[in-house]
Curated annotation (Swiss-Prot):
It comes from Mus musculus (Mouse). Probable sugar transporter that acts as a regulator of glycolysis in macrophages. Does not transport glucose. It is a multi-pass membrane protein. This is Solute carrier family 2, facilitated glucose transporter member 6. Pfam families: Sugar_tr (PF00083). The lineage of its organism: Eukaryota, Metazoa, Chordata, Craniata, Vertebrata. PROSITE patterns: MFS, SUGAR_TRANSPORT_1, SUGAR_TRANSPORT_2.
Amino acid sequence: MQEPLLRTEGLDYDTFPEVPATPGERERAGALKNRRVFLATFAAVLGNFSFGYALVYTSPVIPELKLSSDPALHLDKIQASWFGSVFTLGAAAGGLSAMLLNDLLGRKLSIMFSAVPSAIGYAIMAGARGLWMLLLGRMLTGFAGGLTAACIPVYVSEIAPPDVRGALGATPQLMAVFGSLSLYALGLLLPWRWLAVAGEGPVLIMILLLSFMPNSPRFLLSKSRDEEALQALTWLRADSEVHWEFEQIQDNVRRQSSRVSWAEAREPRVYRPVLIAVLMRFLQQLTGITPILVYLQTIFDNTSVVLPSQQDAAIVGAVRLLSVLIAAVTMDLAGRKVLLYVSASVMFAANLTLGLYVQFVPRPLTPNSTVEIVTLGDTAFNYLTLIPLLATMLFIMGYAMGWGPITWLLMSEVLPLRARGVASGLCVLVSWLTAFVLTNYFLLAVNAFGLQVPFFFFSAICLLSLLFTGCCVPETRGRSLEQIEAFFHTRRMSFRP
């Protein structure tokens, strides 16, 4: 009797006995299979590099333009506030557009499209001859940033296998931090116009690399492009044996082939994950991260640290990069919730310290200098002026270890596939509208009430974030996107039975 070409393998099927792979062989095989996923992820997160670079562009530029002799470019307090905050307004518009583009063009093409407003915005700022050009360029780069913030985490989560999704999910934040650090470093060397010119480079490289990368298999399946989806998954896994994973994804997509109706949106399986993702992005901004990053040098000038504010900003950027690297390594080991707890606790301590310092420690007559006072000698005061730098480093470290990267990752993990494109855009819209309000009114609040008031407010939000994590956020470590989505069909608060 002729043997079938394919048959089910049983316990007695030993025609081709297998020798168990050694740990080293398994590690090399896994690295080989993940190499293409890493390449596709790197190509995508170059958009986050540009986002991080553009976000803090004002940090070295505002002090320079405040001293500008050109009346068309000189900034007063109100203009500086708008120059710093209009980026977030553009980012909110980018998040709004992502609600349409994410599902219309797909994740990859939406990321590539973001390069257009980004490149134009940098070019306008580089050649700015008036405040309106600075604001327009800043808003365009913000629009690109909001679009990438909604599209890149979704793309990365949909192409990554579960065992490395936590580490790869941290790369958007990692590259955003690296972009900010690059801006701080270049700000020590280049004038503000050339900083805008330098921002064009990562955008062009991103377009070039993404042209050769596949689209998300889940998106392709949702558009009934099954053959392309299988080819994309096979390329990403560097393996022809992807049919089991492909069938899992295909079954899940087919069950959710239609859009979410308003009636379904009121069901817990839909609104619970969306609400968790939106509130996480809302609380993330209320911790104070965006105004602190945008006005970092201004904060250091007002707290009179020992080192020049430009060097302080670069040091903080380096600490932020190191912290995100730690989060990327530990996220799949410690889990998401542990890092969120640690992150919120550290940010609370840092914000409270900054508020108490501003409230009770007297300032010198001029920034970055010391004077003799009755209660404190010169040496003691010099040591005290390290507190704002150390506390800011602690805040950035806490944020970058948890609430920075994990909110991006969880947004893409918990959102249901049928609503993922629209809901991720909604998350970014809420996030950046919140950031706009905070950034626009931060300097006004400081001038009216003092620098300590915003820091006390941020510390209270960090306590609220701890409570929210414990009550509402599920642990998604090691779960496939299909398992996470199935979990929200239950009414349990944890994966544990």
